[in-house]
């Protein structure tokens, strides 16, 4: 199943390091495109604690009063408050109320309450969220630890080598893509044989090369092995610790953690998947998942409705080859029922940028004439005004074509893939031009 999007910082790092020598190169980003469950930082910290990995003392608060109470419980005069938003760049982000920074150092319970009240219930805008931002519903308050050394360590699933890898760098505590761009030799990849796992020798070698002091190497080795254990036992696709620190009292601590889990493992990881925060996800993508559709928004203006991930990718490719931009990835799967088609059209047309829809269906499991009935009824009931290009190939395709032609609906039935894609791009441009100059446009079918 084609899935988009992993941690963007990692993706940038993959791309940047593809130019580095093989020994220090991260896996290629083209091999890494995955869409997986992400969980909040405070939940990641809880999971690390369960496996005996050192993390700063802290807890989650959903009100200013709770934040104040947690800060009192932690004690001391050095703490950090972090907005719980599933996006990178929180520290440099800005809230919709003008507050700068989603990660701030605080020195008292009073400050904890003050900043919590300014963060909770407001949207944080970062370089990853886009202008719309993401709602902060909770804050994580933890003790501030001072590090003697900071490192970067991640356990990832690498499709190129068809197995897990450990990516490490002595330059932790900073933007990993910046390190990858400026100094790719500082990033190292260790390939793991799943039949052997992370041995003592391998983990100790990684810890030593990172630069942990002699008294911390064994604890760092144990931490690396525990991270790999979490990776395997919880069906993770990504565990990123940045920074993994050696504190001033020579303790190994995971100061910040990002987890990604394989969406296909939800049936055997119920405890993990109940941690999902759908308020942090695109509502249309959540709705699609509930309907059994694989839907991911993109930035273009040609809607795509396809059955099968491979055909969906080929459809997006040929749209781009003809000068267009797909507005979405949408795979209705083998069960392209009339109900699924209607749901798919509602999702596609909810995007105001969409100026044409390309329906590309191969009728193997489902008959093309059944698809045609669903398509015609959907276009009628939704009273769609934008052009629809339908390419229905396979079982009963002639009957499907006849149904569309006899329907009187403005659906362009085209058999050839190139011609259908070309027509989609051309009609999309016409509609976009009409919108730009604020005039109406109608289409007459040449059939």
Curated annotation (Swiss-Prot):
The cross-references to PROSITE patterns, in alphabetical order and at most eight, read: SUCCINYL_COA_LIG_3 (PS01217)
Q: Where does substrate bind?
A: 307, 364-366
Q: What is this protein called?
A: Succinate--CoA ligase [ADP-forming] subunit beta, mitochondrial
Q: What is its EC number?
A: 6.2.1.5
Transmembrane region(s): none
Protein task? Succinyl-CoA synthetase functions in the citric acid cycle (TCA), coupling the hydrolysis of succinyl-CoA to the synthesis of ATP and thus represents the only step of substrate-level phosphorylation in the TCA. The beta subunit provides nucleotide specificity of the enzyme and binds the substrate succinate, while the binding sites for coenzyme A and phosphate are found in the alpha subunit.
Q: Give the highest taxon in the source lineage.
A: Eukaryota
- Fill in the subunit field for this protein: Heterodimer of an alpha and a beta subunit.
Q: Give binding positions for ATP.
A: 82, 89-91, 150
Asked if the Swiss-Prot or TrEMBL record annotates the protein with the keyword Ligase, the reply is yes
Q: Where, in this chain's numbering, is Mg(2+) bound?
A: 242, 256
Q: Reply yes or no: does the keyword Plastid apply.
A: no
Q: Which UniProt keywords apply?
A: ATP-binding, Ligase, Magnesium, Metal-binding, Mitochondrion, Nucleotide-binding, Transit peptide, Tricarboxylic acid cycle
What does the UniProt entry say about where the protein is found?
Mitochondrion
Q: What cofactor(s) does the depicted protein rely on?
A: Mg(2+)
Identify the HAMAP family for this entry: Succ_CoA_beta (MF_00558)
Provide the ATP-grasp domain boundaries: 45-287
Which residues does the annotated transit peptide occupy?
A: 1-34
Pathway membership, UniProt: Carbohydrate metabolism; tricarboxylic acid cycle; succinate from succinyl-CoA (ligase route): step 1/1
Q: Which organism is it from?
A: Neurospora crassa (strain ATCC 24698 / 74-OR23-1A / CBS 708.71 / DSM 1257 / FGSC 987)
Q: Which GO terms describe its biological process?
A: succinyl-CoA metabolic process; tricarboxylic acid cycle
Q: Which PANTHER family match?
A: SUCCINATE--COA LIGASE [ADP-FORMING] SUBUNIT BETA, MITOCHONDRIAL (PTHR11815:SF1), SUCCINYL-COA SYNTHETASE BETA CHAIN (PTHR11815)
NCBIfam families referenced in this protein's UniProt entry, alphabetically: PRK00696.1 (NF001913), sucCoAbeta (TIGR01016)
Catalyses which reaction? succinate + ATP + CoA = succinyl-CoA + ADP + phosphate
Give the record's cofactor note, including how many are bound. Binds 1 Mg(2+) ion per subunit.
Cellular compartments per GO CC: mitochondrion; succinate-CoA ligase complex
* GO molecular function list: ATP binding; magnesium ion binding; succinate-CoA ligase (ADP-forming) activity
């Amino acid at each position: 199943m084609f899935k988009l999007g992993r941690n963007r910082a990692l993706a940038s790092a993959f791309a940047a390091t593809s130019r580095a020598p093989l020994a220090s190169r991260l896996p290629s980003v083209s091999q890494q495109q995955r869409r997986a469950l992400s969980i909040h930082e405070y939940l990641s910290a809880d999971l690390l604690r369960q496996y005996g990995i050192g993390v700063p003392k802290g807890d989650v608060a959903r009100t200013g009063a709770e934040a104040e109470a947690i800060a009192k419980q932690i004690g001391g005069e050095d703490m950090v408050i972090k907005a719980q938003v599933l996006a990178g760049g929180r520290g440099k982000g800005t809230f919709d109320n003008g507050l700068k920074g989603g990660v701030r150092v605080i020195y008292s319970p009073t400050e904890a309450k003050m900043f919590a009240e300014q963060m909770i219930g407001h949207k944080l805008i970062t370089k990853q969220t886009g202008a719309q931002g993401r709602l902060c519903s909770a804050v994580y308050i933890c003790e501030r630890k001072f590090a003697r050394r900071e490192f970067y360590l991640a356990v990832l699933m690498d499709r190129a080598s068809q197995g897990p890898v450990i990516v490490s760098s002595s330059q932790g505590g900073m933007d990993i893509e910046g390190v990858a761009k400026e100094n790719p030799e500082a990033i190292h990849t260790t390939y793991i044989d799943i039949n052997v796992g992370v041995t003592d020798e391998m983990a100790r070698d990684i810890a030593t090369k990172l630069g942990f002091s002699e008294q911390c190497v064994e604890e760092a080795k144990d931490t690396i092995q525990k991270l790999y254990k979490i990776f395997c036992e919880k069906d993770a696709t990504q565990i990123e610790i940045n920074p993994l620190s050696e504190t001033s009292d020579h303790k190994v601590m995971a100061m910040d953690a990002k987890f990604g889990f394989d969406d296909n493992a939800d049936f055997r990881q119920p405890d993990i998947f109940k941690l999902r925060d759908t308020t942090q996800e695109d509502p249309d993508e959540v709705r699609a998942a509930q309907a059994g559709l694989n839907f991911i928004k993109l930035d273009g203006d040609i809607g795509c409705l396809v059955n099968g991930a491979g055909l969906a990718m080929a459809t997006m490719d040929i749209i781009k080859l003809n000068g267009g931009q797909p507005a979405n990835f949408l795979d209705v799967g083998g069960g392209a029922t009339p109900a699924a088609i209607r749901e798919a059209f509602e999702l596609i047309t909810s995007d105001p940028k969409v100026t044409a829809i390309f329906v590309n269906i191969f009728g193997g499991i489902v008959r093309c004439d059944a698809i045609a009935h669903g398509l015609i009824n959907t276009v009628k009931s939704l009273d769609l005004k934008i052009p629809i290009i339908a390419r229905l190939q396979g079982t009963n395709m002639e009957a499907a074509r006849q149904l569309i032609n006899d329907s009187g609906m403005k659906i362009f039935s085209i058999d050839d893939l190139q011609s259908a894609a070309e027509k989609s791009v051309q009609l999309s441009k016409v509609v976009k031009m009409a919108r730009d100059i604020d005039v109406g446009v109608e289409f007459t079918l040449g059939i």
